[in-house]
Amino acid sequence: MTQAQTAAVQPAAIPVAAPASQRWRVADVVALFELPFNDLMFRAQQVHREHFDANAVQLSTLLSIKTGGCEEDCGYCSQSSHHDTGLKAEKLMDVDTVLDAARAAKANGASRFCMGAAWRNPKERHMPALTEMVRGVKELGLETCMTLGMLEDEQAQQLADAGLDYYNHNLDTSPEFYGQVISTRTYQDRLDTLDRVRDAGINVCCGGIIGMGESRRERAGLISQLANLNPYPESVPINNLVAIEGTPLEGTAPLDPFEFVRTIAVARITMPKAVVRLSAGREQLDDAMQAMCFLAGANSMFYGDQLLTTSNPQTQRDRALFERLGIRASQADALSDNA
């Protein structure tokens, strides 16, 4: 190959990663989004292989431990009491029911068990049951994650003392677009909860939702916010909007799936050591697009038939896709029929 030919196949001269002292400016993130698709994928795969096994994917299962009746008005959410989605509010599950679900998740190959409650914030009366759930799930040999809304300092510490591994609290979108989706909780409220989680010594799981009508620059704004958290999240879930009937975002035009893949790739480049997770809306991606996401640097996914109140690809389909791609679960034998 001649020198000119070699130069022609090299990606454009945009930094693969920001130096430790440099913040990811929105303009820099936009520049990544605007790379030719093949160049962006090449870059993301380079970064991914520097830090992870390129053919291993971590499996998580998500259980709604308290469904519906949430006080918040998040425009995408079927669990908001502000929206008429036909979802009936339920009480907090009892501990034994949660542990039974965790056992089933482990038997199906999950290595992390995530518990979600539709609350603005947990009440003190809920904390004993929540901490018991954490301890019980950890005793089963699973990593634990919870998403319960905003936390006070003492609540974060109680969860940490129980051994909680991760706390999920998404930023959802960029600061500029946020007000078009949510009015009952501020962006700063979310950042404050993340600070409390960090201060308690719990790993942070924080990502967002794309396809809510935001622009590419606003998607870049979300990634910039996440990448500039100090430190950036250990776990970054990327959700593809599920436009649920009865919510304000019902009827939102679907996002171009290549834009979703680009978002995964940009997240990988800007947060090289984070676990990047395919989350809600994965069923809207065909097998080829999911394979593209793994190539772009996604190395975790929610595994199971339901995510809170939205469906998820069936486990058998996931097993078949992994086999076709030569991907294995990061937990040994996690996809075997007898796992």
From Swiss-Prot:
Binds 1 [4Fe-4S] cluster. The cluster is coordinated with 3 cysteines and an exchangeable S-adenosyl-L-methionine. It holds the Pfam family BATS. Residues 55-282 form the Radical SAM core domain. Its cofactor is [4Fe-4S] cluster; [2Fe-2S] cluster. Its EC number is 2.8.1.6. GO terms for biological process: biotin biosynthetic process. Pathway: Cofactor biosynthesis; biotin biosynthesis; biotin from 7,8-diaminononanoate: step 2/2. SMART domains: BATS, Elp3. Disulfide bonds: none annotated. It catalyses: (4R,5S)-dethiobiotin + (sulfur carrier)-SH + 2 reduced [2Fe-2S]-[ferredoxin] + 2 S-adenosyl-L-methionine = (sulfur carrier)-H + biotin + 2 5'-deoxyadenosine + 2 L-methionine + 2 oxidized [2Fe-2S]-[ferredoxin]. The keyword Metal-binding applies. It comes from the Bacteria. Signal peptide: none annotated. InterPro entries: Aldolase_TIM, BATS_dom, Biotin_synth/BioAB, Biotin_synthase, Elp3/MiaA/NifB-like_rSAM, rSAM. One of its GO terms (molecular function) is 2 iron, 2 sulfur cluster binding. Keywords: 2Fe-2S, 4Fe-4S, Biotin biosynthesis, Iron, Iron-sulfur, Metal-binding, S-adenosyl-L-methionine, Transferase. Catalyzes the conversion of dethiobiotin (DTB) to biotin by the insertion of a sulfur atom into dethiobiotin via a radical-based mechanism. This is Biotin synthase.
